[in-house]
């Protein structure tokens, strides 16, 4: 995994919005996250976003648009909006998938702090 000069891990984070809502992945510990993961050495964040989305959900990214960076205590997230094809199926680090249909419905979910912040910024119209 590639590190930012500040020694933070580089991550590609993907927002897929469908009719059902925003796609989220639940990991094996029950933590709810946006699909995504580490950027491999020499890999472009855009390529990592498409790869991680496919690994975790089986979806194929047909269009990715950079939205913004989000810096957490340990990671530097490259956040992308994604149009994707396919039927989502949990795989890799995702134990199951779910959709967030309304921002108000996020409070009972065990969202990671970064996911909560990224979603809030996206829903407020966050851009680069």
Describe each model-derived feature in a short phrase.
Residues 90-128:
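NUDIX/MutT-family hydrolases
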Residues 17-55:
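Conserved Nudix-box catalytic region and its N-terminal flanking loop in Nudix hydrolases
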Residues 1-22:
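Conserved N-terminal beta-strand and adjoining loop/helix that marks the start
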Residues 9-13, 75-79, 114-116:
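Short hydrophobic/aromatic beta-strand or adjacent loop that forms the aromatic wall/cage
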Residues 4-8, 72-74, 91-94:
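A generic structural micro-feature
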Residues 16, 79-83, 99-101:
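Short, well-ordered beta-strand micro-motif
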Residues 31-35, 41, 81-82, 93, ...:
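Functional cleft and adjacent loop/helix regions within the main domain
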Residues 58-88:
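Active-site segment of metal-dependent pyrophosphate-handling enzymes
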């Amino acid at each position: 995994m590639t590190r930012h000069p500040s020694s933070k891990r580089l991550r590609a984070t993907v927002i897929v919005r469908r009719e059902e809502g925003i796609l989220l992945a639940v990991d094996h510990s029950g933590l709810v996250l946006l699909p995504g993961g580490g950027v491999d050495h020499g890999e472009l964040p855009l390529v990592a976003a498409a790869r991680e989305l496919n690994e975790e959900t089986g979806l194929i990214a047909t269009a990715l648009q950079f939205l913004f960076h989000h810096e957490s205590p340990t990671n530097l997230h490259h956040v992308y909006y994604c149009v994707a094809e396919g039927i989502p199926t949990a795989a890799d680090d995702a134990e199951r998938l779910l959709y967030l249909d309304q921002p108000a419905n996020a409070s009972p979910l065990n969202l990671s702090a970064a996911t909560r912040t990224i979603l809030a910024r996206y829903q407020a119209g966050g851009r680069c």
